[in-house]
Swiss-Prot record:
The keyword Ribonucleoprotein applies. GO terms for biological process: negative regulation of translation; translation. The keyword Membrane does not apply. GO terms for cellular component: cytosolic large ribosomal subunit. NCBIfam families: rplM_bact (TIGR01066). Keywords: Ribonucleoprotein, Ribosomal protein. PANTHER family: LARGE RIBOSOMAL SUBUNIT PROTEIN UL13M, RIBOSOMAL PROTEIN L13. The lineage of its organism: Bacteria, Bacillati, Cyanobacteriota, Cyanophyceae, Synechococcales. Belongs to the universal ribosomal protein uL13 family. It comes from Prochlorococcus marinus (strain MIT 9312). Part of the 50S ribosomal subunit. This is Large ribosomal subunit protein uL13.
Length: 143
Protein backbone atom coordinates (compact mmCIF):
# COMPACT_ATOMS: atom_id res chain seq x y z
CA UNK A 1 0.00 0.00 0.00
CA UNK A 2 1.32 3.47 -0.93
CA UNK A 3 1.58 6.18 1.68
CA UNK A 4 1.18 9.87 0.95
CA UNK A 5 4.30 11.80 1.90
CA UNK A 6 3.75 15.12 3.66
CA UNK A 7 6.80 17.39 3.44
CA UNK A 8 8.19 18.67 6.73
CA UNK A 9 9.34 22.25 7.23
CA UNK A 10 12.98 21.10 6.99
CA UNK A 11 12.51 19.39 3.62
CA UNK A 12 10.63 22.25 1.91
CA UNK A 13 12.99 23.95 -0.52
CA UNK A 14 12.31 27.63 -1.20
CA UNK A 15 13.63 29.29 -4.35
CA UNK A 16 13.62 32.95 -5.38
CA UNK A 17 12.02 33.95 -8.68
CA UNK A 18 12.21 37.27 -10.51
CA UNK A 19 9.27 38.53 -12.61
CA UNK A 20 9.42 41.54 -14.92
CA UNK A 21 5.95 43.12 -15.04
CA UNK A 22 6.75 45.34 -18.03
CA UNK A 23 3.94 45.14 -20.65
CA UNK A 24 2.24 42.21 -18.85
CA UNK A 25 -1.51 41.98 -18.26
CA UNK A 26 -2.37 42.38 -14.57
CA UNK A 27 -4.62 39.37 -14.02
CA UNK A 28 -2.58 36.91 -16.06
CA UNK A 29 0.60 37.90 -14.23
CA UNK A 30 -1.11 37.76 -10.83
CA UNK A 31 -2.33 34.18 -11.37
CA UNK A 32 1.18 32.98 -12.21
CA UNK A 33 2.61 34.74 -9.15
CA UNK A 34 -0.10 33.31 -6.87
CA UNK A 35 0.58 29.80 -8.18
CA UNK A 36 4.28 30.07 -7.34
CA UNK A 37 3.61 31.65 -3.92
CA UNK A 38 1.27 28.78 -2.99
CA UNK A 39 3.66 26.14 -4.34
CA UNK A 40 1.10 24.61 -6.70
CA UNK A 41 3.79 24.29 -9.37
CA UNK A 42 5.70 21.78 -7.21
CA UNK A 43 5.09 18.04 -6.88
CA UNK A 44 5.34 18.45 -3.08
CA UNK A 45 2.31 20.79 -2.90
CA UNK A 46 0.25 20.31 0.24
CA UNK A 47 -2.86 22.50 0.73
CA UNK A 48 -2.35 23.05 4.48
CA UNK A 49 1.39 23.85 4.33
CA UNK A 50 3.32 26.79 2.92
CA UNK A 51 5.38 25.03 0.23
CA UNK A 52 5.70 28.06 -2.07
CA UNK A 53 8.65 30.10 -3.25
CA UNK A 54 9.62 33.76 -2.98
CA UNK A 55 8.66 36.05 -5.87
CA UNK A 56 10.26 39.41 -6.71
CA UNK A 57 8.29 41.63 -9.11
CA UNK A 58 10.07 44.56 -10.79
CA UNK A 59 8.75 47.32 -13.08
CA UNK A 60 5.39 47.40 -11.32
CA UNK A 61 4.59 50.81 -12.81
CA UNK A 62 4.62 49.31 -16.33
CA UNK A 63 1.81 46.79 -15.75
CA UNK A 64 -1.06 46.94 -18.24
CA UNK A 65 -4.80 46.30 -18.16
CA UNK A 66 -7.06 45.66 -21.13
CA UNK A 67 -10.00 47.72 -22.34
CA UNK A 68 -11.06 50.84 -20.49
CA UNK A 69 -9.97 49.50 -17.11
CA UNK A 70 -7.17 52.06 -16.82
CA UNK A 71 -9.74 54.86 -16.55
CA UNK A 72 -12.68 52.91 -15.08
CA UNK A 73 -11.28 50.35 -12.60
CA UNK A 74 -11.70 51.53 -9.01
CA UNK A 75 -9.69 50.66 -5.92
CA UNK A 76 -11.47 51.17 -2.61
CA UNK A 77 -10.18 51.35 0.92
CA UNK A 78 -11.80 52.30 4.20
CA UNK A 79 -10.26 54.04 7.20
CA UNK A 80 -12.69 52.36 9.60
CA UNK A 81 -14.30 55.66 10.56
CA UNK A 82 -17.76 56.84 9.49
CA UNK A 83 -17.57 58.26 5.96
CA UNK A 84 -14.02 56.96 5.61
CA UNK A 85 -14.43 55.28 2.21
CA UNK A 86 -11.75 56.37 -0.26
CA UNK A 87 -12.00 55.53 -3.96
CA UNK A 88 -9.18 55.83 -6.47
CA UNK A 89 -8.93 55.00 -10.18
CA UNK A 90 -6.33 52.62 -11.61
CA UNK A 91 -4.49 55.46 -13.40
CA UNK A 92 -3.94 57.58 -10.30
CA UNK A 93 -3.00 54.60 -8.13
CA UNK A 94 -0.50 53.50 -10.79
CA UNK A 95 1.17 56.92 -10.60
CA UNK A 96 1.15 57.03 -6.79
CA UNK A 97 1.72 53.46 -5.54
CA UNK A 98 2.05 50.97 -8.45
CA UNK A 99 3.17 48.21 -6.06
CA UNK A 100 -0.24 48.13 -4.40
CA UNK A 101 -2.01 47.20 -7.66
CA UNK A 102 -0.06 43.95 -8.06
CA UNK A 103 -0.15 43.22 -4.32
CA UNK A 104 -3.95 43.55 -4.19
CA UNK A 105 -4.46 41.40 -7.30
CA UNK A 106 -2.25 38.60 -5.94
CA UNK A 107 -3.63 38.83 -2.39
CA UNK A 108 -7.15 38.19 -3.69
CA UNK A 109 -5.94 34.97 -5.32
CA UNK A 110 -4.39 33.54 -2.14
CA UNK A 111 -6.31 31.78 0.65
CA UNK A 112 -8.14 34.21 2.94
CA UNK A 113 -6.70 32.84 6.19
CA UNK A 114 -3.45 32.77 8.18
CA UNK A 115 -1.77 30.53 5.58
CA UNK A 116 -2.57 33.05 2.84
CA UNK A 117 -1.12 35.88 4.93
CA UNK A 118 2.05 33.84 5.44
CA UNK A 119 2.33 33.15 1.70
CA UNK A 120 1.69 36.82 0.85
CA UNK A 121 4.76 37.84 2.89
CA UNK A 122 6.94 36.08 0.31
CA UNK A 123 5.89 38.53 -2.42
CA UNK A 124 8.24 41.48 -2.96
CA UNK A 125 7.05 44.16 -5.42
CA UNK A 126 9.19 47.08 -6.61
CA UNK A 127 8.34 50.13 -8.70
CA UNK A 128 11.45 50.21 -10.89
CA UNK A 129 13.89 47.68 -12.29
CA UNK A 130 16.11 47.59 -9.18
CA UNK A 131 15.60 45.32 -6.18
CA UNK A 132 17.67 44.61 -3.03
CA UNK A 133 17.52 40.79 -3.34
CA UNK A 134 20.52 40.17 -5.61
CA UNK A 135 22.19 38.05 -2.89
CA UNK A 136 19.38 35.46 -3.18
CA UNK A 137 20.26 34.83 -6.87
CA UNK A 138 16.68 34.98 -8.18
CA UNK A 139 15.86 32.93 -11.27
CA UNK A 140 13.84 34.60 -14.04
CA UNK A 141 10.31 33.16 -14.05
CA UNK A 142 9.09 32.28 -17.54
CA UNK A 143 5.76 34.00 -17.91
Amino acid sequence: MNKTITPSLETIERNWFLVDAKDKTLGRLATEIATVLRGKNKPTFTPHLDTGDFVIVVNAEKIEVSGKKASQKLYRRHSGRPGGMKTEKFESLQERIPERIIEQAVKGMLPHNSLGRQQFKKLKVYKGADHPHAAQNPVLLNS
